């Protein structure tokens, strides 16, 4: 199974949980609490990933990276986006210098 397959399947599963019972689904609970709750979890998981990386513990880095990716996918699904949207943007940027790509976006 490819990385794309597992992320695509997870993305679809998360979207399907949007209207599930928040008492029975952690994902549904996050959706029901809204973007602030999802963003808070992303921040917490990013901090845990940073600490795992600082400690150099490879297995913890994998675990925390998984948590970050999961919560980012929840955020995408909350806004009606998926890993496919991110993949399209990554394909668009492929082969472009990061400096050039950032400059092409202009000011926000």
Curated annotation (Swiss-Prot):
The keyword Hydrolase applies. The keyword Protease does not apply. Belongs to the PRA-PH family. GO terms for biological process: L-histidine biosynthetic process. It comes from Dechloromonas aromatica (strain RCB). Pathway: Amino-acid biosynthesis; L-histidine biosynthesis; L-histidine from 5-phospho-alpha-D-ribose 1-diphosphate: step 2/9. GO terms for cellular component: cytoplasm. This is Phosphoribosyl-ATP pyrophosphatase. Gene3D superfamilies: MazG-like (1.10.287.1080). Its EC number is 3.6.1.31. It catalyses: 1-(5-phospho-beta-D-ribosyl)-ATP + H2O = 1-(5-phospho-beta-D-ribosyl)-5'-AMP + diphosphate + H(+).
